[in-house]
Amino acid sequence: MTNLLFVALGGSIGAVLRYLMSIIMIQLFGSSFPFGTLLVNVLGSFFMGIVYALGQVSHVSPELKALVGVGLLGALTTFSTFSNETLLLMQQGYWFKSLINVLLNVSLCIFMVYLGQQLVFSRV
């Protein structure tokens, strides 16, 4: 039951952060490309790499994993929004933007998980 509370707490923080980052990115760059979703997915992937690597090299409590890994990062990142925004770009005829969105999200997110892990592993 305690872990559920940690997931809920982290999730509420992550959801609010995602919302705020999306608003900021729209204000900075407009809404013609889903930069907000890309940003939260890339940042979330980086921190997920850190959380995973910390769990490999030291003891990370189940509560911290629930709070940060499942809750905060789970709510911060969003595959469903990425998928919906990509489909909307396609439906609007922006095939190149949709392809760029897919390539950037997938490649940058995988790279950022790796980078986060390497940051931790290089310090052990």
UniProtKB/Swiss-Prot annotation:
Transport in keyword set: yes
Binding site for Na(+): 74, 77
Activity modulation notes: Na(+) is not transported, but it plays an essential structural role and its presence is essential for fluoride channel function.
GO molecular function: fluoride channel activity; metal ion binding
Domain of life: Bacteria
InterPro entries: FluC
Family: Belongs to the fluoride channel Fluc/FEX (TC 1.A.43) family.
NCBIfam families xrefs: crcB
Known function: Fluoride-specific ion channel. Important for reducing fluoride concentration in the cell, thus reducing its toxicity.
Protein name: Fluoride-specific ion channel FluC
Organism: Shewanella denitrificans (strain OS217 / ATCC BAA-1090 / DSM 15013)
